[in-house]
Amino acid sequence: MKWVSALSRQTDIDGAIQEAAESITQQLGSDQADLTIVFVSPQFKEFYDKVPDLISRYFKPGLVFGCSGGGIIGNGEEAEQQAAISITSAQLPGVKIQPLQFETTELPDQDTSPSVWREWLQVQVEDNPHFVFLADPFSFQGEEFLAGVDFAYPNSKKVGGLASGAQALGGNALYLGNKIYNSGLVGIALSGDIEVDTIVAQGCRPIGEPMQITQCEQTLLKELEGKPPLKVLEELHETLSDADKKLLQTSLFLGIEMDPMKDSPKQGDFLIRNLMGVDRESGGLGIGALLRNGQLV
């Protein structure tokens, strides 16, 4: 088993993929991989559909899997707010890689048995699979999906994240094989000679006080306790230290209460979600999760 990674900051899509792909083949010592994971910055959104074919032009990638991303990480480097592509490839002898793709409209009912979820995913629990999922936050109900997968595969590891870089539905890219999707979820189930360890990649320190959502529409947060979210942030900004004011500009996230039955939620009781954009006309915020009125954030 071998994993290698490369990142290119070239501003030309062909040149960026060629540079990253040549680094991959050099590190692998081969032009053949079993799995290739690709992340593409939104500066290349006009060329999202070219990515799988371009990768295949330079080496045999195996199954291509990935998505668009506002920040791109590869080979120990990170690129934000600039053109970038990262490619991670693996040679995985003895590992079964099963591609998965779903839309929220297809989800089984939450009250169904584990066997119904397993039949729907078409992944054998006896294979002891581990999962990697990438979802579009504007169209996919990730919490409901993960609750069902946890129910059906309690001993399996599940890792992944949200596609980003877009401000609205249809603007992100999800890659699976030679296909590109603009909504839903793509994933892979890994089984056989492989172990998966999980870590939490992101932790946050709370600022301000918990507030209740009083108006929202899908992923758009319109109102917090009667105020536009942007107004809440402006008021919060005035109370922060200079260091936190700088962090507010680049590292702001929203915490969503995980268990509404808790009387006094504390740090650690909130699910961290990305801010996807700002509607300055209404003062609303785009959030990387489907919201509902009454949630505490």
PLM regions and their residue ranges:
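Small-residue-enriched flexible segments
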Residues: 1-49, 54-57, 62-63, 67-72, ...
